[in-house]
A protein has these predicted regions:
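Aliphatic-rich helix starts adjacent to a transmembrane/signal segment
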Residues: 3-62
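Short linear sequence signals and composition-biased patches located at protein termini or domain-edge surfaces
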Residues: 45, 90, 176, 186-194, ...
Length: 284
């Protein structure tokens, strides 16, 4: 009679138990690696978001002039409102209440700069005899013209109409600004974010904020927000009406970003800040 080699029931149970232990260990290792990767990805994404926000703030606030660009009563811990430069040029031709932005002649030093096309509600500034004068823009059109100026023959087509009947001579330096506001706001889910808003004339006012970075911490020692300093480096008191904008020489924004990574029962906080020194050229 032939006998067949096989496994006893005890051996089968031992083999199954060992296989389960190996598979369980491998599963735990894979899950741990996935969680670690997710935590690292969340932290890196938060760092990238904060870094991008700081770059944007630095570039935009770095173009401000302390004398007129900051809005009185709007330099606060939670918000900063200012006139953001959107275009600069030389006047080509003007009539009462209208002027045209001159294009740069070929081979000349660039004088025309447009970060954003002017629109109704922006403010046009022109250099008068001893100071800058401002007027609200009521219309923007394309109207090709040529003109003579102290700089020679010029041409342009971007024309702005003002709410006041001033006449602006050819060759006059121009600057266009737009009311802009950065503010820390609370979203519908209860989280805090830094938001960006630009003034709109239709309807008049600031639209809903566009999130720049978040979610932010707004309590305790890790409080995200703006701080303001004078020429000596002393921090300015904000009181109930904000910092005195005539004394602001430097602006600091600090972001404490909350990152829900759930690492050993704890979340992560990523912190970054930027200091912007304002220009002190003759206004606006």
């Amino acid at each position: 009679m032939l006998s067949r080699a096989g496994l006893t029931l005890v051996e089968v149970l031992v083999a199954l138990t060992l296989a389960a232990l190996v598979l369980g260990t491998a599963t735990v290792s894979v899950l741990g690696q996935q969680r670690a990767h997710a935590r690292l990805r969340a932290v890196l994404d938060a760092d990238a978001q904060i870094s991008a926000a700081m770059t944007v703030l630095g570039e935009q606030l770095g173009m401000l002039n302390v004398r007129q660009d900051l809005m009185s009563g709007e330099a606060r811990d939670s918000a900063l409102q200012f006139r953001a430069p959107v275009a600069s040029a030389i006047a080509c031709a003007g009539w009462a209440g209208r002027t045209t932005l001159a294009a740069d002649p070929a081979g000349s030093v660039p004088l025309l700069g447009v970060a954003s096309l002017p629109r109704t509600g922006d403010t046009l500034w022109w250099l008068g005899d001893s100071a800058w004068v401002g007027g609200a823009i009521t219309a923007v059109t394309n109207n090709p013209v040529t003109c003579a100026s102290p700089l020679g023959a010029m041409s342009g087509e971007l024309q702005v109409t003002l709410a006041r009947p001033d006449s602006i001579a050819s060759g006059t330096p121009l600057r266009i600004t737009r009311q802009t506001r950065y503010g820390v706001y609370r979203a519908s889910d209860g989280t805090w974010h830094l938001g960006f808003r630009e003034w709109s004339s239709k309807p008049p006012g600031f639209p809903s904020p566009q999130p720049v970075v978040g979610s932010l911490i707004r309590t305790g020692s890790r409080r995200s927000g703006f701080r303001y300093f004078d020429d000596t480096g002393a921090e300015l008191d904000q009181g109930t009406s904000g910092a005195d904008v005539t004394r602001v020489a430097r602006i600091r924004f600090t972001a404490h970003a909350f990152v829900p990574v759930h690492d050993r029962g704890r979340d992560s906080v990523r912190t970054d800040s930027i200091d912007i020194v304002l220009q002190h050229a003759r206004g606006p």
